[in-house]
Amino acid sequence: MLRPLFLYACTFSLICAQEILQLDKIEVEDHYSVIEERKENSIAKRIIQGEELTQYGDMNALEVLKRTPGVTIPEGKGKKGAPGKGYTKVLVDGEEISATSKRRGSPLEQISPDMIERIEVMTNGSAEYTAEAMGGIVNIVLKKPASEGKTIAKVTGGIYNEQPMASVFAQQEGKNGDLSYMFNATYADNTHKDDSSTHIDEPPSVTEKITDEEGRFRALSLNSKLIYTPNAKTKYSFDASLGVNDNKSSSDERIYTNGTLSNVIHNRDESEGVMLWTKLAGQHHISGTELAEWKLKFHQNDSDGETRSGSQLQYDDSLFRVQGAEGSYSRAQGEHFIKTGAELKRLSQQEDIRVLNNGIETSNEHQRLRQDKSSLYAQDEISIGENTVLTPGIRYENVSRDFGASSRLDYFAPSMHLLYRLSLNDNLRASIAKTVKLPRLDELSENVDSSLELNDLNHPDVSGNINLKEEKALSYEVRYEHFFEDKGIISIGGFYRVIDDKIEKLTTLEGGRYIERPYNAGEAKLWSIEMELKKSLDSYVSGLGIFGNATFQNSSLTLNDSKRPIKGTNDYLYNVGVDHTLSAYRLTYGTAYRYVGGYDDPMDENGIAESQKGYGTLDLYASKRLDSTFKAGVNLKNLTGTTIETTTKRYTSGSLVETQIDRENSEPHILFTLEGRW
């Protein structure tokens, strides 16, 4: 029976329902325990191991997530991708990231991959996590101090389109009596140089926009983690992070009308940001089968910026703050592993925006949002015989919002997960969960962001909708897994999701400018088939491993008896790659190719149709152990020189009146690393 296993597991970690799986590859080294955990645990949770996060030369956590299956990061159309702004909820050590302003970058850009222990991806909700998990949950787990003393230093340098890139990472960890500690620091200084083009055909005129952009991003991150263990039953931890950054970019936009240069617009954007995270937590083993945990947290992200576009100047200040407390109680009893918990959290967000045109103030707007959320949950992992584990749960959340006018809503989010072991090496999994997505501040605010002097279909002004309602979804998932004897896996699965009050963003032409606003469009359905293969080929070629995964998806949105796809739903995407280790030379090298399929959206309610071509990215890496202390590496990134091409068409009374084609280009770049461990 599984009862002894549950008793031992809860004593040490009390997280019995976590599945560990490497998403992108099978390491040639021994990861037998990783595969075994996937076979045994009841709630599917994919995990990218720490050693995978640095080998492809990603400079920060945001770049890491862009190559992670199951994570939604919009790209193209001149809009900066940022996870957490869509349907995928991104957490850092279980805490929601500070989303700050839609005008500024993500705090994930300040997290070095060297700080990350693993990334967990869960594609369906469970009671233990937030109900706002409509597109799944990504949890970035930061490293904890090791028991033995260790010093790590890493230097990275490279070139992107003739522009320098550099970063330095240093970490010290160890243990002194009952106190374990870890301190690390990261400094990054990266520049870039890109170009893009826009072709607008609006008879009788044809407009070409050619944009050359240069930028520089600098960031310093200081982090500490302390763990105090006075006895075998009690543990306290304190985490603190301070990050500062500044970002400067400038661009020249040359505009040609019917082949003649008609205008040149100089754009400049400068910003500074400060991020502060603190957390105090405790674990108390009440008995060999009971554990109580608590946590106090304070997070704040502050940024201010200045944007100049032609004769227009905009100042913006943003503040995002989270204060909260939570506690949980876990108990293993017979064939049950029960966990209950409660959470209180206050979120405060504010934005101040001042706009001047030719030196004259044209607007001065202030946006405020305060949200109080209380949550209760209960979850039970039930072992039924030798082959079945059932995990029911329910979560209740009560949300109070003050945004000009007050609003209050509450909801239940039940979930059910099933694991059935068909044989020693075959699993069948199924789950059903109810989730929600609450509108963000920028989606509610009716103030218009018009920071660009000239706008177009793909670069509109942005406004919100104060009448926006939350989305609610019911998600079904099923998956079959087969585990090879030689540390590999093949799986096939899929999900079906029904979404009420789906939020879609629609663009209209108002007063000669395009404005994009969110609306509750109707009932949506999204379904997908997912396949995965990871295999060690060591029996054929020593040290060789392959990996691959693919997702095929489709969608529909019903509004007033008419149907169309959900906007921007890619037809498919896939990842393939190979890794090879030459043990005699202490050398590992590999390649990975990621392709994102396009989409073709028909005309929406406002007469706008949009399509995007698929694009692929090829990366190569090699690393060599020089001796017991040093390791060197080289990364060739984006060898395909990716171009994202988006075509947008505007119709009036059924007739095509405007076509716009945007091309955003990115260049190959090379990175060199030297890492030492003492």
Briefly describe each language-model feature range.
Residues 61-64, 90-91, 106-109, 121, ...:
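N-terminal periplasmic accessory domains that precede
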Residues 490-499, 509-510, 515-603:
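Gram-negative outer-membrane beta-barrel transporters
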Residues 37, 45, 62-100:
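Extracytoplasmic beta-strand/coil segments of soluble accessory domains associated
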Residues 223-245, 267-405, 411, 421-423, ...:
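Face-selective signature of the C-terminal outer-membrane beta-barrel domain
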Residues 269-275, 365-373, 407, 427, ...:
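Outer-membrane beta-barrel signature, preferentially recognizing the C-terminal barrel domain
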Residues 26-56, 84-89:
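N-terminal periplasmic "start-of-domain" segments of outer-membrane beta-barrel proteins
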Residues 595-600, 623-678:
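C-terminal beta-signal and adjacent terminal beta-strands/loops
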Residues 95-123, 170:
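Short acidic/polar hinge/loop motifs at secondary-structure boundaries
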